Amino acid sequence: MAEVSLKILKKHNLEHISELRIDPEILLQRFSPGCSMCHCNGTCCAEGVLLDLKDKERILAHADLIKQYLDPQQEHDVQKWFDHNIEYDIDFPSGQCDGTAVRDGGCVFLDSKGLCALQKTALAEGMDKFALKPFYCVAFPLVIDGHMLTTDDPEFTNRSQCCSIVPDGSITVLDVCREEFEYILGAEGLEEIEKVFKEEVASPVESAV
């Protein structure tokens, strides 16, 4: 099998990564018409998420505000919001990450209506809706793995209750996750990856698998 030449993105919002590689598989994945993150009923918030220590610090700095928007039964002790298990990881700006805790079958910030308390707080207080959310919460189902942009597979791509890859699919990951791509890459980076996807449609890359 011929070696696949990896596409490199130089326009993006990740200051700790100079050249962001694109996983060839995300150029090949196709989904059914109508698949959309807006319609997603997946279970990503049933688990915690890894977050950069700076994201953690920002959440703790707004702890008193966030508590006002928690359900009564949600955890109000800030010391129990995180795993306190620091790991070293090159895909996080600080090089270190922690994880949000899981309580009652979901992320500690997931309320009884399936809403994120962090996003709920930000919207109610006039902030950008993503101001308090960890990077990988907003980016999901896109992830950075070894400075490579890819999808959280099989978490995203093979869900029986959500979007799944199909052989005769007509829409791409970019179609499904445009807002998430723009969050990671910025407006210029979005234009750059749009060109990459258009090139793939014109001349499909060979699967790396």
Predicted feature residues:
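Short loop/turn segments that flank or connect secondary-structure elements
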Residues: 1-209
